[in-house]
Amino acid sequence: MAKEIFFSDEARNKLYEGVKKLNDAVKVTMGPRGRNVLIQKSFGAPTITKDGVSVAKEVELKDSLENMGASLVREVASKTADQAGDGTTTATVLAHAIFKEGLRNITAGANPIEVKRGMDKACEAIVAELKKLSREVKDKKEIAQVATISANSDEKIGNLIADAMEKVGKDGVITVEEAKSINDELNVVEGMQFDRGYLSPYFITNTEKMTAELQNPFILLFDKKIANLKDLLPILEQIQKTGKPLLIIAEDIEGEALATLVVNKLRGVLNISAVKAPGFGDRRKAMLEDIAILTGGEVISEELGRTLESASIQDLGQASSVIIDKDNTTIVNGAGEKANINARINQIKAQIAETSSDYDREKLQERLAKLSGGVAVIKVGAATETEMKEKKDRVDDALSATKAAVEEGIVIGGGAALIKAKSKISLNLQGDEAIGAAIVERALRAPLRQIAENAGFDAGVVVNTVENSKEENTGFDAAKGEYVNMLESGIIDPVKVERVALLNAVSVASMLLTTEATISEIKEDKPAMPDMSGMGGMGGMGGMM
């Protein structure tokens, strides 16, 4: 296929057109009075959204060169969402502002490489200043405020996330699911839960809830299959003497071993239940070890020279209760020593820091949460499927932003933190490097300008007022149209969101500004299908039956 090549200003201007179109679609969603964007789908109802990254992902332009520019900034929006959970619109608006301002200077004769160097230095200084301006999230109220802003000013979602985080802790797992009703719900599972249910319905003790519930049980952990009853008999006899319930967690339990457990349960000889161990392979062994540490027991493992026959009461874990349904097992208040649990938590945290695999990291974080905080499930309700999807996206965004706030701290929101950070830096740069720094500094006004514009206010006046204010925490509340103390009004952003948005915006803008040639495919129009009307009645085929 033939290729089209553009050089210098012509190439950059084409790229800019694509960036501008993407920015124009995304920027309208910014701020408390941002507008909706309606997106056509190839099937089903159109999507209505105020989520910047959802809009950016849908922008696909006809002109291949414009599309190259748009796709680079689209990647920045997605990357910002992945790293910080929010700030996609901020990153897009900043990237556009930096590219636009830089293009003007480079067209006027500035050296792109020197300009890039100045931009990088300014970005570094502003990020350092943002970190100085940040402070820790102090309480549940501030968590709710961060979540509310990220959920497009939905206080109910903000409070729901704050409740979830309060109950499971900052390391706890919070998942978002679709509810089967129109109401939002928060369900918290205290203790460790894993996705394995009872091996036989005969183990059920609560027929109303269809669950097997064991109070103060012993917990036997074995890393192989149990099929032979002879191996299991010694420990069962010891358990019977204590009169306590028993939970067996093993790779699998089958044959006569499972049949005997069921018969003993039905006859009332033993209150017993059995489940498969969670995970697979090495991960299963690690999770069994986690359960052992949580419950104060030991994993009976043939690799360590132990057999099931040799197991004694001292090897068993304990918990205040265990609840098992057909899909999940929940161990509440394991009897493990706090020091051992904390050591295991620190070990998993170290593994998370070292791993380069996203999948492994996710699984390690799940294990960490099971040990340290428990699990909270936010169920999002809505009247229609379209509303449900849009709301679930907002809850996901708000949850990620809240975790970012807890991780790195908060700064004043509404685009004001970037302007305050800009006023505090002093870079002694010369020539085109100074121009590069000035480009970034001017672009930092863009988010606040856009928020004010979307709310229907004079953007120039708003930016000047905030910039010239002597009060460090003063910003513009676009929802009310007032200049307020942003911290006191609860208008705050995670510093990680601001930092990542700026770094990614400068990165893509400087890459676009230093582009000197572009190569793209020439889209050829496919010839139309020939007109069939002149082919007559195909009368010669009349003899076919």
Curated annotation (Swiss-Prot):
Q: Its Gene Ontology biological processes?
A: protein refolding
Q: What is its EC number?
A: 5.6.1.7
Q: Mind listing the UniProt keywords for this protein, alphabetically?
A: ATP-binding, Chaperone, Cytoplasm, Isomerase, Nucleotide-binding
Enzymatic reactions: ATP + H2O + a folded polypeptide = ADP + phosphate + an unfolded polypeptide
The organism's superkingdom is given as Bacteria
On whether Nucleus is a keyword of this UniProt record, the answer is: no
Mainly localized where? cytoplasm
Q: What does this protein do?
A: Together with its co-chaperonin GroES, plays an essential role in assisting protein folding. The GroEL-GroES system forms a nano-cage that allows encapsulation of the non-native substrate proteins and provides a physical environment optimized to promote and accelerate protein folding.
Subunit record text: Forms a cylinder of 14 subunits composed of two heptameric rings stacked back-to-back. Interacts with the co-chaperonin GroES.
For this protein, the record's PANTHER family field holds: 60 KDA HEAT SHOCK PROTEIN, MITOCHONDRIAL
Q: What is this protein called?
A: Chaperonin GroEL
Recorded source organism is: Campylobacter lari (strain RM2100 / D67 / ATCC BAA-1060)
